[in-house]
């Protein structure tokens, strides 16, 4: 007799474009830090939809806010103002310390907007159209053409060339490498504050502060991608705040909506006053009342439930348990990360096999790069959840 999961998977393969090698489970519902498949099997989730579900699944106050907004209005377009967009922007500006917001539908759209901001800022200064952006090797910013162009991984890029021009790559955490790429054409430097897909590499403090200084000295815009590492994940609302570094442009998404598709790029006052104007950029769905009601409630719940404080409190316990695994197993060579964005580097044991075995054992974890086991759980995890994760993970080695 065919299982329920197998039936759904077979149907999916008939109609859904094969752009993912999906694991062979069909998830149906979630509660707290757990997901359940159509067979009723429970999974402890340390992936959080790839760092999306900061508040966990089915938070009643979050769900109610969405239901309430559905009963009012979901979409109006950017031809008009709407209250949820205003409130969400106010909260994002306050949390980030920046000045103006443009809401998008995703992280990759936010990156596209940030690239346009940098180019327009430089164009207004000198009237030239041959400006350059410096990006980082092993970075990941998205798969649309502009975002792909600043992604430092030829594997993703090669089939889609030619990409947009004027992009140069420097080594992450190597300030001299960045300096060597700067010319009078450089309009922006884009980097993740913590590299995610590249293998969970936090920026060195000296590096990110040095890049900020280079940008100030050369009137170059610093674009920080906080799509994965932002929204409390590292123990600060945004990871750059832990370094005492403010970007000119910041991109965010993922946990910004905690499941509702939404992204944003946020500008400081200098950049907002000297870049995009009406007609330069637009979106049909970006800033819609439904998505912005989600964003607004996320910020409310972060404050009400003291999410950032909890991340700071729980992080040492997670790091202690992961460091113990490094000591115990020869094939785990190092732990990297900040807050609840952690990676274990595996040597001689394929990370994909561990991820698959973990699923069998009721644990959801994911990979980063070629050999890193990535842990990006909901930010509401407890010590008991961490203990259970360690137990299930060890069974998966």
Predicted regions and their residues:
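Conserved N-terminal phosphate-binding loop of PLP-dependent enzymes in the Aspartate aminotransferase
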Residues: 2-397
């Amino acid at each position: 007799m065919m299982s329920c999961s197998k039936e759904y998977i077979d149907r999916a393969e008939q109609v859904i474009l094969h752009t993912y090698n999906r694991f062979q489970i069909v998830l149906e519902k979630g509660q707290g830090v757990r997901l359940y498949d159509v067979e009723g099997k429970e999974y402890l989730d340390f992936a959080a939809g790839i760092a999306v579900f900061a508040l966990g699944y089915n938070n009643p106050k979050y769900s109610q806010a969405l239901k309430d907004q559905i009963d009012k209005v979901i979409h109006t377009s950017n031809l008009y103002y709407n209250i949820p967009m205003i409130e969400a922007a106010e909260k994002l500006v306050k949390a980030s310390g920046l000045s103006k917001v443009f809401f998008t539908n995703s992280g990759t759209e936010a990156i596209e907007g940030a690239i346009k901001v940098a180019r327009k800022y430089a164009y207004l200064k000198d009237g030239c159209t041959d400006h350059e952006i410096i990006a980082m090797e092993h970075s990941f910013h998205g798969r649309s053409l502009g975002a792909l162009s600043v992604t430092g991984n030829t594997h993703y890029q090669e089939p889609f060339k030619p990409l947009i021009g004027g992009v140069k790559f420097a080594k992450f955490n190597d300030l001299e490498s960045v300096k060597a790429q700067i010319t009078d054409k450089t309009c922006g430097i884009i980097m993740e504050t913590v590299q995610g897909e590249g293998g969970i590499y936090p920026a060195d403090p000296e590096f990110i502060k040095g890049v900020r200084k280079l940008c100030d000295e050369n009137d170059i815009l610093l674009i920080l991608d906080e799509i994965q590492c932002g929204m409390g994940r590292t123990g600060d609302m945004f990871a750059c705040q832990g370094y005492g570094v403010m970007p000119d442009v910041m991109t965010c998404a993922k946990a910004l909506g905690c499941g509702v598709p939404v992204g944003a790029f946020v500008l400081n006052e200098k950049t907002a006053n000297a870049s995009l104007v009406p007609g330069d950029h637009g979106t049909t769905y970006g800033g819609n009342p439904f998505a912005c009601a989600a964003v607004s409630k996320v910020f409310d719940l972060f404050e009400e439930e003291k999410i950032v404080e909890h991340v700071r409190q729980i992080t040492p316990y997670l790091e202690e348990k992961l460091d113990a695994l490094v000591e115990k197993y020869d094939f785990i060579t190092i732990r990297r990360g900040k807050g609840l964005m952690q990676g274990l580097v595996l040597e001689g044991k394929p990370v994909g096999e561990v991820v698959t075995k973990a699923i069998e054992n009721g644990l959801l974890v994911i990979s980063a790069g070629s050999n890193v086991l990535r842990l990006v759980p909901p930010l509401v995890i407890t010590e008991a959840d961490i203990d259970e994760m360690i137990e299930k993970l060890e069974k998966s080695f």
